[in-house]
C-alpha cells in the first residue's frame, strides 16, 4: 500500500557510525518504497552552517541528494540543526519546512512540529529557543569563523547535557495544555513530532473530538520510523541491523 515515512532525532555525527549505518540502510531498503519522506528535526547532532563541508557532512548531503532525486523529501529544522539553510536545501534537493507546518497527508490535514516548542515547562530551553530563532542571531552566528562556531557548538552541547540531567521527566516532556492549544489553533486531529525521544501514540480528546499525537523515536539504539499508510493506518517501527 502507498505510504509516507517520518523520521527525526537521528543526531548524526561522525562519532556515531552505527547511527549513520542505520540511516544509510533506511535510505537503501525503506525510503525507496515510500511516497515521500519527512525529517522532523535534529537530523544532525549539531549543524554550524551550510559552509561546514566536512567529509562526513558531504557524505550525508550526497545520500540525501540521491534520495531526493527520486522521492519528495521534506526537512524541518530542530533545535540542534536550526542553522540549516537554503544552500543545504539546494545541495540536497530537500524542501525545507517551517516549524510548525500543516500538510495534507492523503487528504488529511496533519500538523508537523519538531517538538521542542511544546516543552513549555523547560523555561531555560524556551528562552534559548527564542534567542536562537531570531534571524539576526543566526546571521551573527554564521558570520563567525568556522573554528569558533565548532567551539561554541561543543560548549552548547555540553551545557545542554548538564541542563537535561537536572530536569525531571515531566519538565523534559511536552506540556499537555500546549499540545491542546496548538492543535486547536491549527484545527487538526493529528500531530506528529519528535524531540522528546519518547516514541508513542497518544489518544487525546480536543473539543470533544478524538485526536492523536504521534511521537517519533530517536536513533541512539537503532532506527525508528513512522509508517503512515494511504488508508490512514500507521505504525511506529523500530529496526536494528547487524554491524
Curated annotation (Swiss-Prot):
CDD domains xrefs: MPP_YbbF-LpxH
Binding site for Mn(2+) 1: 9, 11, 42, 197
Pfam families: Metallophos
InterPro entries (UniProt xref): Calcineurin-like_PHP_ApaH, LpxH-like, Metallo-depent_PP-like, UDP-diacylglucosamine_Hdrlase
Membrane association type: Peripheral membrane protein
Catalysis performed (reactions): UDP-2-N,3-O-bis[(3R)-3-hydroxytetradecanoyl]-alpha-D-glucosamine + H2O = 2-N,3-O-bis[(3R)-3-hydroxytetradecanoyl]-alpha-D-glucosaminyl 1-phosphate + UMP + 2 H(+)
Enzyme Commission code: 3.6.1.54
Top enzyme class: hydrolase
CC cofactor: Mn(2+)
Gene Ontology molecular-function annotations: manganese ion binding; UDP-2,3-diacylglucosamine hydrolase activity
Keywords: Cell inner membrane, Cell membrane, Hydrolase, Lipid A biosynthesis, Lipid biosynthesis, Lipid metabolism, Manganese, Membrane, Metal-binding
Pathway annotation: Glycolipid biosynthesis; lipid IV(A) biosynthesis; lipid IV(A) from (3R)-3-hydroxytetradecanoyl-[acyl-carrier-protein] and UDP-N-acetyl-alpha-D-glucosamine: step 4/6
Binding sites annotated in the UniProt record for Mn(2+) 2: 42, 79, 114, 195
Protein's job: Hydrolyzes the pyrophosphate bond of UDP-2,3-diacylglucosamine to yield 2,3-diacylglucosamine 1-phosphate (lipid X) and UMP by catalyzing the attack of water at the alpha-P atom. Involved in the biosynthesis of lipid A, a phosphorylated glycolipid that anchors the lipopolysaccharide to the outer membrane of the cell.
PANTHER family linked to this entry: UDP-2,3-DIACYLGLUCOSAMINE HYDROLASE, UDP-2,3-DIACYLGLUCOSAMINE HYDROLASE-RELATED
NCBIfam families with a match to the protein in the record: lipid_A_lpxH, PRK05340.1
Family: Belongs to the LpxH family.
Name listed for the protein in its UniProt record: UDP-2,3-diacylglucosamine hydrolase
